[in-house]
């Protein structure tokens, strides 16, 4: 069970421990930009450990991209080939989901309709987006992140209605006044002239 690193107390783990573990599960020597470690108990009992690689996965824009999430049940490995574990626009996320509430003999068909897993996924997406919001407070770090993952984040606006308010704060745009910098929608609106009533934009296919 990969020694269930994600079950260890967060306070006992250092940044190097997380980086070493990320490299061991991803074969990515560039390291991770951030990690998101959650240990939930209560209505649902599960652990998740997600990483955002510093560099976008090579197959991120391939239709047959490989899932980056490994599913465990009670520390027993189940699958690393289920794209339903994370929304398509977060396909660059790497990591582990480990549930204590699912039966070990669960089938793929049941997994896709399972309420427990659906709730874990929903909670995880919110947690990941919250971390992106924290990252966005540091303009330099967020620029580094957005350069790699800006396009998938924009896809989220079309795919994830539940989290659209957060996603609209995360997307960035180039404007005729911003030169090479990207700015948030909120900043664009704030900088509009008083007499400007319309926003014009160009889309690319």
Q: Where do the language-model regions lie?
A:
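Conserved GHKL (Bergerat-fold) ATPase module
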Residues: 1-205
């Amino acid at each position: 069970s990969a020694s269930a690193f994600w079950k260890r107390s967060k306070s006992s783990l250092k940044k190097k421990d997380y980086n070493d573990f990320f490299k061991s599960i991803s074969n990515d020597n560039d390291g991770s930009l951030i990690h998101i470690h959650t240990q939930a108990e209560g209505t649902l009992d599960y652990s998740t450990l997600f990483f955002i690689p510093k560099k976008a996965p090579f197959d991120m824009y391939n239709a047959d991209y490989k899932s980056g999430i490994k599913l465990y049940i009670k520390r027993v490995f189940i699958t690393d080939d289920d794209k339903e574990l994370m929304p398509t626009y977060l396909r660059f996320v790497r990591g582990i989901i480990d549930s204590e509430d699912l039966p070990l003999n669960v089938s793929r068909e049941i997994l896709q309709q399972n309420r427990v897993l659906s709730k874990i996924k929903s909670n995880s997406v919110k947690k990941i987006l919250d971390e992106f919001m924290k990252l966005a407070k540091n303009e330099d770090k967020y620029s580094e992140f957005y350069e790699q993952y800006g396009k998938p984040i924009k896809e989220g606006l079309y795919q994830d209605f539940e989290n659209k308010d957060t996603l609209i704060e995360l997307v960035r745009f180039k404007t005729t006044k911003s030169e090479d910098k990207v700015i948030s929608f909120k900043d664009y609106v704030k900088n509009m002239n008083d007499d400007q009533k319309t926003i014009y934009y160009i889309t690319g296919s």
